[in-house]
Swiss-Prot record:
Binds 1 divalent metal cation per subunit. GO terms for molecular function: 3'-nucleotidase activity; 5'-nucleotidase activity; exopolyphosphatase activity; metal ion binding; nucleotide binding. It comes from the Bacteria. This is 5'-nucleotidase SurE. Belongs to the SurE nucleotidase family. Keywords: Cytoplasm, Hydrolase, Metal-binding, Nucleotide-binding. It catalyses: a ribonucleoside 5'-phosphate + H2O = a ribonucleoside + phosphate. A divalent metal cation binds at D8, D9, S42, N95. NCBIfam families: surE. It is found in: Cytoplasm. It comes from Treponema pallidum (strain Nichols). Its cofactor is a divalent metal cation.
Amino acid sequence: MRILLTNDDGYQAAGIRALHAALKAAPEGYEVTVVAPDRDRSAVSHGITTLEPVTVKEVEPGIWSCSGTPVDCVNRALRQVCVGTPPDVVVSGINEGENLGTDIVFSGTVAAARQAVMYGIAGIAASLLPVSDFGTGCRFQALARFVARHVRALAALSSEDVLVNINARSAQAYARACYARVASSDI
């Protein structure tokens, strides 16, 4: 399975690094390519860059930095980096902070998964709610392992008009998962 990994926090962010490591370590032997923003691009929604050039450069083997938005990253990956070998799934994240309810409208993380779906490619967004107790922040490893273990099943849930949006609390491990539809924050 070929996986394109991106985010909106930047290619050096802890969340994408943890997810990249978990996917590469998975026994399934996933082929993982990272194309992610060169800096934090949080809350840019489905923005695309139109008034300046968008550049990509390989900063490590298989890891590309992009000067544009998360949607630009998906576009450049498909047109420049993954030419001839398109991904089977685009995984965006792990975002530091939740993407729930109407917040998904503003999320660059979710927008990248949505862009994949618009191309007919399965799209998965993964976000983590930080632990506020004692300022411990996000612990990405458990969610990274969960996504790596279940990426095929999660990709199968995506369709021509459905992306998968995962939100989890920082934890050591996850015992179960549940499905929910997007709801407004007014509920």
